Amino acid sequence: MAIILPDLPYAYDALEPHIDAETMTLHHDKHHATYVANANAALEKHPEIGEDLEALLADVSQIPEDIRQAVINNGGGHLNHALFWELMSPEETQISQELSEDINATFGSFEDFKAAFTAAATGRFGSGWAWLVVNAEGKLEVLSTANQDTPIMEGKKPILGLDVWEHAYYLNYRNVRPNYIKAFFEIINWNKVNELYQAAKA
């Protein structure tokens, strides 16, 4: 059973004007599809390790060395993007009271969290991701990862993530990454974030 490219949970133009349809089409149909194809090609070389990417990336030492980086790059790329699509919504959603209180306790206020997340996304040199995670101690934490590395590799559970590779925003925002980050906060699917938060804390 090969890894499958998931459908977008909304139309390509559903997130406009924040993310344009052309960007969504290229991002999903080309970039994400390539990660899926390359992850499958790598895993086919070692069928004995299976296809559970979350389990494999939680302990990359178990991935045979000849495909390890390919699985990190492409398996991570698939997991990150499959989550990313679900973390956005054209519908207005609300953060849960429990998560809101945890954010306030951890960062001081929602605005302080937003500033920390924005700093992580803006400060990531080159390509990568910004994340809100639940760490091994059950605490919220903001961090960024390079390339397609996933917080799962650090034993952390991502509940919100933003792709800051240029392919995610360049058509619409050119080199002004902060405007893209600001737009992202307008389309966050808090229903999904709340769900991931509850699962991570369980």
UniProtKB/Swiss-Prot annotation:
Gene: sodA
GO terms assigned for molecular function: metal ion binding; superoxide dismutase activity
Biological role stated in the UniProt entry: Destroys superoxide anion radicals which are normally produced within the cells and which are toxic to biological systems. Catalyzes the dismutation of superoxide anion radicals into O2 and H2O2 by successive reduction and oxidation of the transition metal ion at the active site.
Protein residues bound to Fe(3+): 27, 81, 163, 167
EC number: 1.15.1.1
Keywords recorded for this protein, A-Z: Iron, Manganese, Metal-binding, Oxidoreductase
Gene Ontology annotations for the cellular component aspect, listed alphabetically: cytoplasm
Cofactor(s) listed: Mn(2+); Fe(3+)
Record-given protein name: Superoxide dismutase [Mn/Fe]
Domain of life: Bacteria
Reactions listed under catalytic activity: 2 superoxide + 2 H(+) = H2O2 + O2
Family: Belongs to the iron/manganese superoxide dismutase family.
Lineage, broadest ranks: Bacteria, Bacillati, Bacillota, Bacilli, Lactobacillales
Pfam families the UniProt entry points to: Sod_Fe_C, Sod_Fe_N
Binding note for cofactor: Binds 1 Mn(2+) or Fe(3+) ion per subunit.
Record: residues binding Mn(2+): 27, 81, 163, 167
Record annotation: effect of changing residue 98 to D: In strain: ATCC 13813
